[in-house]
Amino acid sequence: THHHEDHAGGVRAYLAEGATLVTTAGNRAYFERIASARRTIAPDDLSAKPRRPVFEMVSKRRTFSDGERTVDLVDVGPSPHANEILVAYLPQERLVFQADLFGIGWGTPIPAANTTSVHFAKRLQELGLQVDRIAAVHGRTTTRAELEESLGKQVAATQ
């Protein structure tokens, strides 16, 4: 999704296996540094078999399909959280998978939206993404109605 370490921590294991890293151009230098970092105290698989990362860049949107199911990687940045940040959108399922843009914990009340969530909702609208469910890296899967409720609480708090 983006370059923060809690979302990119395992990338070296994938690179060691020869996986192609799909990201945005602005994140390339970060991932090149991660790939070239020396691990001498606790060598990992990439240290044992070093290789240069292979990149596939996403500029705005990249669609993957197997003929039955489609996944769109969409850059919803720049956002208050990261300049370039990808979401995975499954149009058939009306589902978006995102990291750090909107989240509600398990058994917690719906919070007032923060600036990042407000931006996320705006980008969903601008991009025409038809979303019913929002899967989160941190927190539970939520609904569009819960996002709207969160936005309503943010507006009410500012009045």
PLM regions with names:
Residues 13-15, 36-37, 111-113, 148-151:
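Short, glycine/charged-enriched secondary-structure capping and boundary segments
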Residues 25, 145-159:
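Binuclear metal-ion centers of metallo-dependent hydrolases, dominated by the metallo-beta-lactamase
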Residues 1-22, 126-134:
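Active-site metal-binding motif and surrounding structural segment of the metallo-beta-lactamase
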